Amino acid sequence: MDIKRLDVSHIDRLWELQTAYKAEIGEDAPGEPERARLAEAIQQGRIAFYGAWDADDLIGCCSVTAGFSTFDYAPSGVFEDFYIRPEYRHSGVARRLVQYAYRESGVSSMTVGCADCDIPMYQALGFSVPLGNLLAYGG
């Protein structure tokens, strides 16, 4: 298994995982406009994606969007888009991918917003500092 940062040349493989993730959680599949916006964001460096590969197969991905936090007055990242193909789960891929994304993104901390049912998984992966509630504003 190899883990590396993804770029816009990987958009087809990444899009397969994005679509599989949305299907697994019961959301509508994203369309071509969303794909184009994602490719543009990757191209412009507004989001960093990392991928786990088994030979030529992209088997897992995650993203880190960097910002600055007064939590520790250093670069921080929002960890999202985490998906491991079902047949590769519980094999260490997730842990390696999280560790790689943290190291390579250059952030001093990463936060994740997740469903209650996913809290034990994220805690097992090292997300252990509770920061209260995470709410999204949609304007």
Regions found by a protein language model. Give the residues of each.
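A short beta-loop-alpha structural element at the N-terminal edge
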Residues: 1-16
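Conserved GNAT-fold acetyl-CoA-binding loop/helix
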Residues: 15-39
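A short helix-loop-beta-strand connector motif used in the catalytic cores of GNAT acetyltransferases and
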Residues: 39-51, 78
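Conserved beta-strand in the GNAT
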Residues: 51, 57-66, 78, 83
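A conserved beta-turn-beta hairpin within the catalytic core of GNAT-like acetyltransferases
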Residues: 67-79, 89
